[in-house]
């Protein structure tokens, strides 16, 4: 199956927004406590899908794996845009 030149709509369920935000915060704190650079580790996980970027410490690995990576990216983009004055 090839790519098309037409725009495709991508929409995720809004029900996980708060949960994803809370999970990212908890994972960030766990990474920080273990001495990792949390941003680098979360980006590594989101880009690769390799859970080894997130430690098992405080159940962080299982927490972040509850969500699809595209859901995490959507929440990060939404948060960034809202923080920069975009009304979504």
UniProtKB/Swiss-Prot annotation:
Highest taxon of the lineage: Bacteria
Family: Belongs to the UPF0297 family.
Name of the protein in its database record: UPF0297 protein SAG2091
Native species: Streptococcus agalactiae serotype V (strain ATCC BAA-611 / 2603 V/R)
Lineage: Bacteria, Bacillati, Bacillota, Bacilli, Lactobacillales
């Amino acid at each position: 199956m090839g790519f098309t030149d037409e725009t495709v709509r991508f929409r995720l369920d809004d029900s996980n927004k708060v949960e994803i935000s809370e999970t990212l915060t908890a994972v960030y704190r766990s990474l920080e406590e273990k001495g990792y650079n949390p941003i680098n580790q979360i980006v590594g996980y989101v880009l690769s899908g390799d859970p080894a970027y997130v430690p098992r410490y405080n159940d962080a690995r299982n927490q972040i794996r509850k969500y699809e990576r595209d859901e995490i990216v959507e929440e990060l983009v939404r948060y960034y845009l809202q923080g920069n004055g975009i009304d979504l």
